[in-house]
């Protein structure tokens, strides 16, 4: 992912193994700012340990989280107050998502596990007429501009890990225990395919190897 010397990269990997922090949770508050203050129903695709789904419950009357990993879904249920308007399902979101419409659909660091265009089409189908889709995705660095962002992200990543963990070693949080795989699409390809499937979608490259996509159905 970078042109940094291997010795430095190994040292960084060792540091982050003992000072982990959730890059995806870093964007949760930003996601909330993209949504209306009140929602009827929300769907969180790739809900993991349920952190975002529980946050969405502060805005929505009902939140449904869906994930293919039964272990992490069990953990999400354990961490969620039974009185909260949140439910979780183990299923393939593209084939078995609870029928919409949804006023908001969120998908964080999950869409690269799916056929990208098919996923966007599916999400569009499940949105209400005035619904909003918010995606935080992962891309494969390719052009020089990606590596320049990478060069900024690496020291920022170390600083955030130190701040989040208050300088102490820590175990991996539950939200970081689900299986993952690297992204295969570049940001340029992501933008091209997204704007074909969702005309008017707003995409932006972000720090920590992420991009964001926001689309309002109207």
Give the role of each language-model region:
Residues 49-51, 55-95:
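Class I SAM-dependent methyltransferase SAM/SAH-binding core
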Residues 106:
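A conserved beta-strand element that flanks and buttresses the S-adenosyl-L-methionine
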């Amino acid at each position: 992912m970078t042109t940094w010397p291997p010795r430095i990269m190994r040292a960084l990997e060792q540091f982050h193994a003992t000072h982990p922090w959730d890059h995806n949770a870093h964007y949760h508050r930003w996601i909330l700012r993209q949504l209306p203050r009140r929602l009827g129903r929300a769907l969180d695709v790739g809900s993991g340990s349920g952190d975002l789904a529980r946050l969405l419950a502060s805005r929505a009357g009902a939140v449904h989280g869906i994930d293919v990993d039964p272990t992490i879904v069990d953990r999400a249920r354990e961490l969620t107050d039974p009185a909260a308007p949140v439910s979780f399902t183990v299923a393939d979101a593209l084939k078995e998502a609870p029928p919409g419409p949804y006023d908001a659909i969120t998908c964080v660091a999950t869409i690269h596990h799916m056929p990208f265009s098919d996923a966007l089409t599916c999400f569009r189908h499940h949105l209400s007429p005035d619904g909003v889709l918010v995606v935080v995705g992962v891309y494969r660095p390719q052009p020089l501009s990606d590596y320049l962002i990478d060069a900024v992200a690496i020291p920022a990543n170390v600083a955030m890990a130190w701040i989040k963990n208050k300088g102490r070693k820590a175990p991996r949080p539950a939200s970081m225990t689900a299986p993952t795989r690297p992204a295969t699409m570049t940001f340029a390809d992501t933008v091209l395919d997204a704007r074909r499937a969702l005309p008017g979608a707003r995409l932006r490259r972000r720090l920590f190897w992420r991009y964001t996509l926001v689309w309002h159905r109207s």
